Amino acid sequence: DVSHPVMESIYNQYYQEPRYRPSTITAQRLAGGVVGKKVGEGFYTYSEGKANMPPEPKLPSVKEFPPVWVSPRASRRLELLQLLKDLGANIETGASPLPHALTLVAPLGFDVTTVAVVERLDPARTIGIERLFDDAATKRRVLATNPATRSDMRDAAHALFARDGKAVSVVRDSGGFITQ
């Protein structure tokens, strides 16, 4: 119930910059009095003052995990390699990935597609992982596919990074990860 007025204020402070334009849906819901935790509706539905979170998607079933190759340009690469080791991944250490390896990139400020092209990686096997923050400081890991990522590679990455019980979100490629 306070979000829409704040979004309108920001939009107006930036001289109606289109990228800050609030959604018309929030204006309509606010006018109708059907938005906000107090009325039980909003981004989530609420019951007894708590958000009803959607259930986590079912983890993909993976019979055999491919070896994992991490880009030398990956942000927080050493931490990522340690995480993979802790998760029991078979880490590939060659200068370039073998043809059957899952290829991991951890871009900062770039999309997965661009990184795959610049680094000349096979986009069908390339997945991005959010590494802006230390893994211990987060409740969720975020993976990003590019338009060419194979479903078996997506599923292998999802299952691998969820091995320790931490929640994993798989998103489509975009101009940057959620926290960037």
Annotate each predicted stretch with a short phrase.
Residues D1-Q180:
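N-terminal glycine-rich phosphate-binding loop for ADP-containing cofactors
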